[in-house]
Amino acid sequence: MEVNGGGAAGLPEAWSQVRAPVIVPLLRLAVAVCLTMSVLLFLERMYMAVVISGVKILRRRPDRRYRCDPIPDDDPELGTSAFPVVLIQIPMFNEREVYQLSIGAVCGLSWPSDRLVVQVLDDSTDPVIKEMVRIECERWAHKGVNITYQIRENRKGYKAGALKEGMKHGYVRECEYVAIFDADFQPDPDFLRRTIPFLVHNSDIALVQARWRFVNADECLMTRMQEMSLDYHFTVEQEVSSSVCAFFGFNGTAGVWRVSAVNEAGGWKDRTTVEDMDLAIRASLKGWKFVYLGDVQVKSELPSTFKAFRFQQHRWSCGPANLFRKMLMEIVRNKKVTIWKKIHVIYNFFLIRKIIAHIVTFAFYCLIIPATIFVPEVRIPKWGCVYIPTIITLLNSVGTPRSFHLLFFWILFENVMSLHRTKATLIGLLEAGRANEWVVTEKLGNALKMKSSSKSSAKKSFMRVWDRLNVTELGVAAFLFSCGWYDLAFGKDHFFIYLFFQGAAFFIVGIGYVGTIVPQS
């Protein structure tokens, strides 16, 4: 009894002995580092806000900066020879719900049929789905579309491997440009007529990237949150990068490449899970320019289940960090681009947007600030924990004005997702076990509507409690709630208001009540 009592009594004493010489200095250092990263992120956001304002005021649209005359189609002497031969690649993997949408949209493009080659690169492992896709390709081939259905013996290199394999065919040598669409993307008929002229009339342009438009943005609150983040990416980040230095990350789909630029850059590589970004950086280091067309929009689908969204965010966060690790010295040693472009790629593109933005969000707002509740000697200035994040949040709202009223929920959800993004970023930087893990984002198409309309399926829609739980989120929620109660009882800064709301957000995600729930078949 004396031992137990002594041990219990010794805990506060041990804490007080460790607190002053160890905990306080370490926490102050962590606060200083996080404040520095917050300032860097704030300056980056302000820089983009100023530039995008200038772009809009000065009307620096792509059609004003580059020649983009329409390709003539009324010359009887030239006929269709005025149109370059374009290759369309549609990579897919077990895309039962959406394969018809992308194939149908691509086959409906307004382009001479003898100047268009469509490749369906099917890596599906389900033989039933493979047969369905093959039949769909045959159906369009019978209508006169030059479409080929191609499979591989293995999935080596995943999407990059499929695209690389598709470029090896002899007929590709006749193609000047290649457009890529993921299986859930549906380009409008005039897509090529609005993008190809930029490549035809400007020999230094390698890539034309279109904007994504989300057909299921109103599916649930989670898809609205995604729309807000991605709209900011397209309307601000891509627009600014295109206008300032003609460089940005290829989004992997809804874009058109000059084939010669792809070949000069070394083609598709599967060394990371962001083969699109990899190719874009290598092409940029060769001196090629990119153009972003915000007024050309391609319909696509957002992941509406939390599991699919989480896997997607892991790939999108881990891949860039891993690519940064592998390409840093290659960028530094490059002789073809200016020092300012190198700084933009290393600092703005990689360090701030792909690494610091993820890490500071989780470390500062979900760990460090709550931890200071227990160590009142460590103070955080209001400009660091209130003003800067508020301004950054407001700046993010410009991409989706219709969702301005959801900003409060958006920032809470972004903080929750920063847990996974930070973890993925560190895995990529350290090139740990899951650094090259590729999980195809689940697309539901109309499946959810069809299943939910069935009463028999509705009875099976309830998942087992254990399958819904996200233990890590529940752990963070417990930590935040503990900090909140302690602050409510002993604190003076009213941090408990934020801590309770943020803890509730982690708890809701932790018990699986976010996104849509797909009824079991």
From Swiss-Prot:
Ranges that cross the membrane: 22-42, 355-375, 391-411, 471-491, 495-515
Gene Ontology BP, a term: cell wall organization
MF annotations from Gene Ontology: glucomannan 4-beta-mannosyltransferase activity; mannan synthase activity
This enzyme's EC code(s): 2.4.1.32
Record Pfam families: Glyco_trans_2_3
InterPro entries in UniProt: Glyco_trans_2-like, Nucleotide-diphossugar_trans
Catalytic activity: GDP-mannose + (glucomannan)n = GDP + (glucomannan)n+1
Annotated localization: Golgi apparatus membrane
Principal subcellular localisation of the protein: Golgi
Membrane topology category: Multi-pass membrane protein
Catalytic residues, chain numbering: 123, 276
Record's keyword terms, sorted: Cell wall biogenesis/degradation, Glycosyltransferase, Golgi apparatus, Membrane, Transferase, Transmembrane, Transmembrane helix
GO annotations of cellular component type: Golgi apparatus; Golgi membrane
Source species, domain of life: Eukaryota
Residues reported to bind substrate: 182, 184
UniProt family annotation: Belongs to the glycosyltransferase 2 family. Plant cellulose synthase-like A subfamily.
Function: Possesses glucomannan synthase and mannan synthase activities in vitro. Mannan synthase consists of a 4-beta-mannosyltransferase activity on mannan using GDP-mannose. The beta-1,4-mannan product is the backbone for galactomannan synthesis by galactomannan galactosyltransferase. Galactomannan is a noncellulosic polysaccharides of plant cell wall.
Protein's name in the database: Glucomannan 4-beta-mannosyltransferase 1
